[in-house]
Design a protein with these regions (language model features):
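Intrinsically disordered, low-complexity regulatory regions
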Residues: 2-130
Length: 130
C-alpha cells in the first residue's frame, strides 16, 4: 500500500489495514472475523504508540509502583465513566456524540494502552500464567 505524501493525513482505517499487512507474519492462516481483525490492528497500533510515548516518558507509568499504576488506570476509567454518565452509560452513544480528538475515544485508547503496559509488566515478571 502506498504511503501518503507529506502533508496528507492517512485515514485511521487505512493506517490499521497497512499495519495489519506489515504485521501479517504474526497472524495464522485461520480466517478471522472483522472485529478480531480490527483488534489485531489496534494491538499493532497500540504497540507503535506506546513505543513513541516510551521515547518521551520512559517507564514513568510505573514509577510509583503498582499502586501508582493502578491509580493511573483508575483516573482514565473515572474520565470515561464521567463521560458516559450523561448517556445512561451507553458508551457507543457517548462516542457517537463526542467526536473530539481529545474525547472519550482518546481516553479509551489511553486506558487500553495502560492496561497493555500493566499486563506486559506482569508477563515480564513471570508472575502470571500466559
Amino acid at each position: 500500500m502506498a504511503r501518503k505524501k507529506k502533508g496528507e493525513q492517512e485515514h485511521h482505517e487505512d493506517f490499521m489495514k497497512r499495519k495489519l499487512l506489515e504485521g501479517a507474519d504474526y497472524a495464522t492462516n485461520e480466517p478471522r472475523s472483522a472485529i478480531i481483525t480490527r483488534v489485531m490492528c489496534l494491538g499493532i497500533e497500540d504497540a507503535d504508540e506506546l513505543h513513541k510515548a516510551e521515547k518521551s516518558y520512559g517507564d514513568s507509568w510505573k514509577q510509583r509502583g503498582g499502586v501508582g499504576a493502578f491509580m493511573m488506570a483508575a483516573r482514565k476509567w473515572d474520565r470515561i465513566e464521567k463521560q458516559v454518565l450523561g448517556h445512561i452509560y451507553d458508551i457507543f452513544l457517548a462516542m457517537d456524540e463526542d467526536r473530539r480528538p481529545e474525547g472519550i475515544l482518546d481516553d479509551i485508547r489511553d486506558l487500553r494502552r495502560y492496561l497493555f503496559l500493566i499486563d506486559a509488566e506482569m508477563c515480564g515478571r513471570g508472575s502470571q500464567d500466559d
